[in-house]
Amino acid sequence: MLKNGYIKLYRSLLDWEWYDDTVTKCLFLHLLLTVNAYDEDWKGIVIKRGSRVSSYTKLSEELHFTIKQIRTGIQHLERTGEVARTAYPRFTVFTVTN
């Protein structure tokens, strides 16, 4: 995860269907800000650009929402195609798909 640089947000985000859902909106913006800008190797697997390794627990700690709220937010984002999730035994790779 880069600590510098920027992301571009369009004002049309205001019309996004999840904009009024605080948890889902915060979760999506957090993922946008924390995904890899470049492909990186991590414990023998390649984490692609636009992806990050995390877990529901870790996201819950970072955002100060409950695990259930994080899980529901991820389900919303998966259902509408903004985020994809690949589960492994000890971690999950979240990918921003838009």
Where do the PLM segments sit?
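Winged helix-turn-helix DNA-binding recognition segment
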Residues: W18, V35-T97
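Long, low-complexity, charged/polar intrinsically disordered regions in eukaryotic proteins
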Residues: M1-D20
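Short helix-coil-helix linker/hinge
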Residues: D21-K25
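Short alpha-helical "packing" element that flanks the helix-turn-helix/winged-helix DNA-binding module
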Residues: L27-L31
